[in-house]
Amino acid sequence: WERMCLVSLRALAPSLTRITVAAAVGAALHIGQGNPDLVDAKAVEFSRAVLTQTDVEGEVISCEGPKDNAPAFMRREKVGTGKGPKVEFVLDPVDGTTAASKGRKDAISALACAPAGCFQVLPDDGYYFKVATDYHSVNSISFDMSIEEIVRTVADEKRLHLENFTVIMLERDRHAEILQRLRKLGVRIILIPDGDIAAAVAT
C-alpha cells in the first residue's frame, strides 16, 4: 500500500507544480503595488482554480493566512475533482506576501501533499520554532536540543567552524533572544525581512 501511495503521489507531481505555478502567476499580477492582501487573494484564486481541476480527493488541513486575517484557503476545505487518490494539503500560495507587494525577491509559492492522514494538524493561531538544513544533519538534530546544540551539530556535519557557518533567520522581535544567543555563539547571521521558505530552500 505504501508503495502504491508513493507511485500515486509521484504521478501527481506535474499537477502539484501547476498549482504552485498558478499561485505565482496570480501573485505576479500585483507585484510592487503595495497591497499584500491583493497578492494573497489572487494567488489563492488562481491556485484554487487549478486545484478544482486536479484529479484528487483532497482536503486542505492547514494553510497560511487565517491567523493574519489574510485571504486564504479554508481549513478542511475540500479540493480536487473527487477522483484519484485521497490526499491532504498544506498550502501557502505566497510565502513572502509583503515582499511581493513591495517588489522584493524571495516570495515563493509552496505546498505539501501527502496521503490522507499523514500530516499532523497543529493549531494555526501562533508561530512555531522551525529548523531547515540539508540531508547531512537531518537525522542528527531534534527539537529537544538547544539552539546552540543544533547549530554546533549542523556545523560539525558540514565540517565547518562556527565562524564560517551562516544562519539565516527572519528579523522579528520575537526572535530577539535566539538572535542574541546565536551572536554569542559566533556564527554568521543573515537577517531577512520575509521569505523563510526561500531561505530554507537555499540550505
Predicted regions and their residues:
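N-terminal subdomain of lithium-sensitive/metallo-dependent phosphomonoesterases centered on the IMPase/IPPase/PAP
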Residues: 1-90
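A short glycine/serine-rich beta->alpha loop
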Residues: 9-13, 98, 135-139
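DPxDG-like acidic metal-binding loop motif
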Residues: 84-95, 99-120
